[in-house]
Amino acid sequence: MKLIPIAKSKPLILLTSKKNPLALRREIEFERIRELRCIMYENFKFEEWLGILGFEDDNKILYVFDRGGLLDAIKQSNYSTVMMKRFSDMSYSSECVEIPVVNAPCGMSAYLMYHSAYVPNPREKIFIRQLKALFND
């Protein structure tokens, strides 16, 4: 397997509905996150992400499979999630706000992983270069 770093140690944000009382905050302390109603992607292993956030294995976290389900739950049910700060001014959703997470012990990184026998074509190489440039601006 090969790993290509796309973005390293990017700041964390709390994504929540504009209707959520948290939406009025300018920032949120990292320590406060585990007190919130959280929703996460099911494909994250506990020790890889939730453990880093300080959640206990018995916390009641809503798990979803896809981005649409995640955004629907955030918009309609006052759930929140922790994500990587986007590289553009566009929000994840016009009905949500992104609140900076302060005092986090780490940022979030993104990597492209592929089998070492696979050779990316020229178009894919251009895409990877452009994506890296977006995150590094």
Regions found by a protein language model. Name each.
Residues 15-23, 109-120:
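A bilobed periplasmic-binding-protein/Venus flytrap-type ligand-binding module shared by bacterial periplasmic
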Residues 22, 34-57, 85, 121:
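Secondary-structure junction motif
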Residues 26, 49, 119-133:
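Short amphipathic alpha-helical coupling segments at ligand-binding clamshell hinges
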